[in-house]
């Protein structure tokens, strides 16, 4: 993450908060904390997306990094992707008739209708008798697939 220092009020501002900082400090211009580059026009800091790392800053000649090579490889891969992408021709849309499947309705011995996809709460809400709810809940079983099934007695 790139962090800037406001040269007007000497406040440390992360890049994501620079626009908000202009409301408090309208004449703000920033200096990157990592690479010490000053952006005096007030807008060019937006293009400053990558910067040197702390290792590179403090180790100077001792630092051996492949940052430039990685960036070049990424650019090459992006160019290859753009070249290999076929030009898409708009295909004609074929409308298929929508066929609704009849819902499976399973009736229990208590006369409770079980619809596939219906929540257990709604099923229990339709039941009036407390004893029927109790026996219904006792007959629910979890199968080997982890699904709740109604065990027929």
Swiss-Prot record:
Q: Which domain of life is it from?
A: Eukaryota
Main location, first listed in the record: nucleus
Family matches, as InterPro entries? LYAR, Znf_C2H2_LYAR, Znf_C2H2_sf, Znf_C2H2_type
Gene Ontology CC, one term:
nucleolus
Zn finger (C2HC LYAR-type) location: 1-26, 27-52
Summarize where Zn(2+) 1 binds, as residue positions: 6, 9, 21, 25
Return the annotated region ranges for Disordered: 63-96
User: Which UniProt keyword terms apply here?
Assistant: Metal-binding, Nucleus, Repeat, Zinc, Zinc-finger
Please state where this protein is localized.
Nucleus, Nucleolus
Compositionally skewed regions (Basic residues) per UniProt? 65-83
Q: Which GO terms describe its biological process?
A: negative regulation of transcription by RNA polymerase II; rRNA processing
Q: Which GO terms describe its molecular function?
A: DNA binding; zinc ion binding
Xref: Pfam families: zf-LYAR
Give the residues the record marks as binding Zn(2+) 2: 32, 35, 48, 51
Question: PANTHER family, per this entry?
Answer: CELL GROWTH-REGULATING NUCLEOLAR PROTEIN, CELL GROWTH-REGULATING NUCLEOLAR PROTEIN LYAR
What family does the Swiss-Prot or TrEMBL record give for this protein? Belongs to the UPF0743 family.
Question: Could you share any additional remarks the record makes about this protein?
Answer: Present with 3430 molecules/cell in log phase SD medium.
The name this protein carries in UniProt is UPF0743 protein YCR087C-A
Give the species. Answer: Saccharomyces cerevisiae (strain ATCC 204508 / S288c) (Baker's yeast)
């Amino acid at each position: 993450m790139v962090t800037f220092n406001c040269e007007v009020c000497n406040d440390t501002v992360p890049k994501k908060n620079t626009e908000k900082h202009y409301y408090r400090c309208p004449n703000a211009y920033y200096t990157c904390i990592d690479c010490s580059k000053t952006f005096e026009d007030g807008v060019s800091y937006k293009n400053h997306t990558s910067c040197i790392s702390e290792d590179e800053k403090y180790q100077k000649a001792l630092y051996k990094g492949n940052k430039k090579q990685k960036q070049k490889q990424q650019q090459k891969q992006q160019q290859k992707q753009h070249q290999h992408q076929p030009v898409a021709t708009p295909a004609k849309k074929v409308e298929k008739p929508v066929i609704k499947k009849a819902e499976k309705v399973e009736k229990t011995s208590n006369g409770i209708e079980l619809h596939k996809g219906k929540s257990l709460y709604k099923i229990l809400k339709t039941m009036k008798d407390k004893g029927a709810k109790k026996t219904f809940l006792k007959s629910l079983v979890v199968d080997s697939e982890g699904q709740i099934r109604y065990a027929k007695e």
